[in-house]
């Protein structure tokens, strides 16, 4: 089995490393554990950047931009993905995809296979690790989080041909130093993921508890196909 996990361990009493190891044990030698390892702090086109420079003078924002950390797949921590994601990313033998904004980290037999290809122009599309997980019919486990963070739904945005926009971020050069790179991809929009998830939850997920908090388990293919139908019908 291949398992994509989103987890917030806050208020669960669960510890990241023991949970990671328990999941790997359940998956077995042939299984693969995947987590998002996203990074927003190296981009000047992200909502988090706009929030941080709001109220700054042009000089202050330019100085802030110049000091932004460059993405390095080997060392840059994930941001806002939680302790479990970091415990996977930093584990011995972990693999990380190369995208400077929406990388994934994985452990297990097919980790390198799933994360080998991740072009700039496909944050979470068919050519990304998410697309590979969809084709492999992976499962999703969400612990103590809601559908508004369900990464799988983003793949449906590519299938419904969402409009494009420009992205820009700073990355580490192989020989040292840093450089800014600009590229086009679809405009990712998670504002209606809660509603998409509420409609999906009727009969398409298994519910339980981990650490006394809600847990959901479902097929990534069923989630993406549902989101594609929902977006086709309801997004303008």
What does each model-identified segment do?
Residues 1-236:
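N-terminal and secondary-structure boundary signal
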């Amino acid at each position: 089995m291949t398992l994509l996990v989103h987890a917030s361990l806050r208020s669960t009493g669960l510890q990241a490393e023991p949970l990671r190891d328990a999941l790997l044990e359940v998956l077995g030698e042939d299984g693969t554990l995947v987590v998002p390892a996203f990074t927003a702090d190296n981009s000047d086109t992200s909502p988090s950047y706009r929030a941080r420079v709001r109220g700054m003078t042009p000089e202050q924002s330019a100085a802030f931009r110049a000091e932004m950390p460059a993405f390095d797949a080997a060392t840059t921590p994930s941001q806002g993905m939680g302790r479990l994601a970091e415990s996977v990313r930093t584990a011995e033998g972990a693999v990380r995809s190369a995208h400077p904004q929406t990388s994934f980290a994985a452990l297990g037999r097919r980790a390198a296979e799933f994360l080998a290809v991740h072009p700039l122009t496909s944050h979470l599309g068919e050519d990304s690790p998410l697309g590979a997980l969809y084709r492999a019919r992976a499962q999703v486990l969400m612990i103590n989080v809601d559908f508004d963070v369900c990464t799988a739904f983003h793949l449906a945005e590519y299938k419904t041909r969402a409009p494009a926009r420009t992205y820009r971020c700073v990355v580490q050069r192989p020989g040292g130093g840093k450089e800014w790179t600009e590229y086009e991809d679809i405009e990712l929009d998670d504002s209606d993921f809660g509603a998409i998830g509420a409609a999906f939850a009727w009969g398409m997920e298994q519910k339980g508890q981990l650490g006394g908090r809600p847990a959901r388990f479902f097929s990534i293919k069923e989630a993406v196909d549902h989101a594609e139908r929902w977006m086709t019908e309801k997004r303008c």
